């Protein structure tokens, strides 16, 4: 069972959006990227995502000003250049699909051109920050009230706990040429071997356990298959990377005390600083219906929230049919528009990175970045 994190709403001291101090020093880009990865590992990102350093000026490149934005539009790029940014941290990756050419034809190509011409690097964390324990989804959960949270889809550790991806085990009695077997498997690269005495069917035997890579597994099996009796006793286990506590996509939040849906709506509006949001009432639900469990996912949460049992789904956007499906099950759905469930995190990020980077560089927030959709 996964451990849970207890979320208590807190007031965070806000730094001005444009901090500029001549006492700040520079950081080498590579050193800064290493620190950013220490803050939230890019290994947390989804496999389909495009994260990390997307645009790099010719080295050496030093950073005095880090510019934070949710979306890097041409308007935001102009602001970043005016404020002398050396590195733009854009939550959403401005380069996602492969580019076949870099011309002045499209706005995303123009972003790359302007960045390189002005020696500005571009970095995107995206789903790595969604999954991180101190990331976007945890920030979104702060607006619900005091609650216990856990990831809906926990992340896996980047590495296996032991060498190899598979474990192969077999038992051999002393009448078999065990020394020959052990010598052969130890000679295969990518294999670690342990052995210990074991009693099987009333007979003293030796239990052999091998951790192997996929490639080594096939080599070991090819050797063991030469001994029919030994091969038939061989067990193969596929190893899994361990789950990471408090890290993963979405959050399932259990409130310490139930509140009405109407109260929850006001809390979310206040947290996201929104005058309006979109609501789909679950079948049989009203604004006075109690809310105890909230499943949330910043951005587009349809796939993450699908099938999760909760009183309320909170996300930026979902497809029409996903909303209908949730409502039919009595689940209320609140949609706030995609980036409105993400952008507010940047203020917390500004302060957290300031501490993490020991205030070595200027960290400023975009003032022109905004959700493209408006209620009219």
From Swiss-Prot:
Recorded superkingdom: Eukaryota
Function statement: May function as a transcriptional corepressor through its interaction with COPS2, negatively regulating the expression of genes involved in neuronal differentiation.
Modified residues (N6-acetyllysine): 108
Protein name per UniProt: NIF3-like protein 1
GO CC terms, sorted: cytoplasm; mitochondrion; nucleus
Protein location: Cytoplasm; Nucleus
Self-association and partners: Homodimer. Interacts with COPS2. Interacts with THOC7.
Gene3D superfamilies referenced in this protein's UniProt entry, alphabetically: NIF3 (NGG1p interacting factor 3)-like
Family per record: Belongs to the GTP cyclohydrolase I type 2/NIF3 family.
Residue list for modification Phosphoserine: 258
Molecular function via GO: identical protein binding; RNA polymerase II-specific DNA-binding transcription factor binding
Modified residues (Phosphothreonine): 254
Keywords, comma-separated and alphabetical: Acetylation, Cytoplasm, Nucleus, Phosphoprotein
Location of the region described as Mediates interaction with COPS2 in the Swiss-Prot/TrEMBL record: 243-376
Pfam family name, one: DUF34_NIF3
Swiss-Prot/TrEMBL GO biological process terms: negative regulation of transcription by RNA polymerase II; neuron differentiation; positive regulation of DNA-templated transcription
């Amino acid at each position: 069972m996964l451990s849970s994190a207890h979320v208590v709403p807190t007031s965070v001291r806000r730094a001005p959006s444009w901090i500029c101090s001549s006492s700040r020093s520079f950081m080498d880009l590579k050193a800064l990227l290493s620190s950013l990865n220490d803050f939230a590992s890019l290994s947390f990102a989804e496999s389909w995502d495009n994260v990390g350093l997307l645009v790099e000026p010719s080295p050496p490149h030093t950073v005095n000003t880090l510019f934070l934005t949710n979306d890097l539009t041409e308007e935001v790029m102009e602001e970043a250049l005016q404020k002398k940014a050396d590195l733009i941290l854009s939550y959403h990756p401005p380069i996602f699909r492969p580019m076949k050419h870099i011309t002045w034809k499209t706005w995303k190509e123009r972003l790359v051109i302007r960045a390189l011409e002005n020696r500005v690097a571009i970095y995107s964390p995206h789903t790595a920050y969604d999954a991180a324990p101190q990331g976007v989804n945890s920030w979104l959960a702060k607006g619900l009230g005091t609650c216990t949270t856990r990831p809906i889809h926990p992340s896996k550790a980047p590495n296996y706990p032991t060498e190899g991806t598979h474990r192969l085990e077999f038992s051999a009695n002393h009448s078999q040429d065990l020394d020959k077997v052990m010598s052969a498997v130890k000679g295969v690269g990518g294999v670690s071997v342990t052995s210990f005495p074991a009693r099987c069917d009333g007979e003293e035997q030796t239990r052999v356990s091998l951790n192997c890579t996929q490639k080594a597994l096939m080599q070991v099996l090819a050797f063991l298959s030469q001994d029919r009796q030994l091969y038939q006793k061989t067990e193969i286990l596929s190893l899994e990377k361990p789950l990471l506590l408090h890290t993963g996509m979405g959050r399932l939040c259990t409130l310490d005390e139930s509140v009405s849906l109407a109260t929850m709506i006001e809390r979310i509006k206040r947290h996201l600083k929104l005058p309006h949001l979109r609501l789909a009432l679950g079948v049989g639900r009203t604004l006075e219906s109690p809310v105890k469990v909230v499943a949330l996912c910043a951005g587009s949460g349809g796939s993450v929230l699908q099938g999760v049992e909760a009183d309320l789904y909170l996300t930026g956007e979902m497809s029409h049919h996903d909303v209908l499906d949730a409502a039919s099950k009595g689940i209320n759905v609140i949609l706030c528009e995609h980036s409105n469930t993400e952008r507010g995190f940047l203020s917390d990020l500004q302060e957290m990175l300031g501490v993490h980077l020991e205030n070595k560089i200027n960290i400023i927030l975009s003032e022109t970045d905004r959700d493209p959709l408006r209620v009219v």
